[in-house]
Amino acid sequence: MAFTLLFGAGVSGDVATASAVGMIGSFLAAAALIVVPAASFLLWVSQKDALERGR
């Protein structure tokens, strides 16, 4: 049913491609703004803790 609604509505491939590119761009932006800084912070804390325990 959804297949018929999607292609019966006249949605072009260009619109679907633009939407997919936008979604991928959003994922990359989220990774750059949220995941990378959080991972960097956690690695920094982990390394700092390991150095303090080694003393």
Curated annotation (Swiss-Prot):
Main location: membrane
Gene Ontology BP terms: photosynthesis
Record-annotated membrane-spanning stretches: 24-44
GO cellular component, one term: plasma membrane-derived thylakoid membrane
Keyword NAD: no
Keywords for this protein: Membrane, Photosynthesis, Photosystem II, Thylakoid, Transmembrane, Transmembrane helix
Coiled coil regions, renumbered to chain: none
Keyword Glycosyltransferase: no
Subcellular location: Cellular thylakoid membrane
Entry membrane topology: Single-pass membrane protein
A Pfam match: PsbX
Functional summary from the UniProt entry: Involved in the binding and/or turnover of quinones at the Q(B) site of Photosystem II.
Subunit structure: PSII consists of a core antenna complex that captures photons, and an electron transfer chain that converts photonic excitation into a charge separation. PSII forms dimeric complexes.
Family, per entry: Belongs to the PsbX family. Type 2 subfamily.
HAMAP family xref list: PSII_PsbX_2
Protein name (record): Photosystem II reaction center X protein
Organism this protein belongs to: Prochlorococcus marinus (strain SARG / CCMP1375 / SS120)
Organism classification: Bacteria, Bacillati, Cyanobacteriota, Cyanophyceae, Synechococcales
Gene: psbX
